[in-house]
């Protein structure tokens, strides 16, 4: 179900297990091995939820007991596109769920002169326009990088309805900015934070995800 009051935002069920995982990764005292382990658990949950939104077609198979089972098969192929570098942390979670999945990368950094996001690099599957795309970035703060990455995908022929944006934490401002540009794209997230601080970090947040995950 879409998370009110945001249309096309799908929040993971706020179970005690999930809240416990977020408590660990938000804690500034958590060491890197634990931060990586528990972040990976959340990422896996996000990927599984993203897969729930892919279209399917009926498929009946025969079991080893010579009985019929009415199931489904996914329609179309998928790929992941990570926003480098933090988004690369989510690639393994996608690979764990989807064997031999194609992965693309987009590098966006802040222009020091304008303070605006700037595209530096992209490497995407040649047939990306024919695939469903999981856009991967752990944090949605202002939405600038995600908006630019999505513009790259659309310019490469990907239809907005085939894009699913997966992240661990969103801000209200980031959601509003992103959906002002792309209202039909589904966002799958695990947490909605209350806002941004003066440095444009999510609050309560967890700091710089990439630094904590890669220990740089």
Curated annotation (Swiss-Prot):
GO biological process, one term: UMP salvage
Binding site for uracil: 202, 207-209
Record note on cofactor: Binds 1 Mg(2+) ion per subunit. The magnesium is bound as Mg-PRPP.
InterPro entries attached to this UniProt entry: PRibTrfase_dom, PRTase-like
Record keywords, A-Z: Allosteric enzyme, Glycosyltransferase, GTP-binding, Nucleotide-binding, Transferase
Pathway annotation from the record: Pyrimidine metabolism; UMP biosynthesis via salvage pathway; UMP from uracil: step 1/1
Binding-site residues for D-ribose 5-phosphate, renumbered to this chain: 201
The EC number(s) this enzyme carries: 2.4.2.9
Family as reported in the entry's similarity comment: Belongs to the UPRTase family.
Name of the protein in question: Uracil phosphoribosyltransferase
